[in-house]
């Protein structure tokens, strides 16, 4: 389940791509598929997530010619030289960071001139509903510390040395799922409504029925849970 359209971005053969806050590697595998001649690095602070990502990468490594690697480090101080990467992906990370503008400076530093920066984060009003329904949702350790507005995010990111290209929204069908989880936060693991809706999402992800994909795309401009943005380093 990807939160970007990688068909919009072309990078040189043999390019280097960083997935900042890669988690268990969801976007690493999409990157490996789209850019088989690139070298991919996943960076995260969570050792167990990196272990799972490495196991997945070992399975998918046959689809890339250049390889993939993982490192545990902070997005505030990355162990890479200036101008190292052709693209940096940062999906659903910035909303967790207290000093996210420091991370933007670090991303700008490790990107090559004219390199691409692809951030995503929760869309404003679907996220606002989650905060309204459950205080625990955004107060849990490591949770979301802010809600971005689209124009605010574009202006702030642009002020750190990036040119805005475009944006789009994804995962509309996930918004009601998170609303249900927030509504029944204390019992979400056993709640039948949450379980029933989760089964619909699992069907969409694993089986990809056409009617659910079409419904998701129709609703994305209004209901999309995540907003993805495309920037280029000045």
Region annotations inferred by a language model:
Residues 3-8, 152-153, 207-216:
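An amphipathic, basic-hydrophobic alpha-helix
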Residues 132, 171-234:
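A C-terminal cap/extension of S-adenosyl-L-methionine-dependent methyltransferases
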Residues 147:
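Short aromatic/basic micro-patch
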Residues 2-130, 229-232:
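Conserved SAM-binding loop
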Residues 29, 105, 151, 155, ...:
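Active-site phosphate/pyrophosphate- and oxyanion-stabilizing loops and adjacent acidic/basic residues
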Residues 162-172:
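Conserved S-adenosyl-L-methionine
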Residues 58-60, 135-138, 182-186:
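Short, hinge-like loop/turn segments at secondary-structure boundaries
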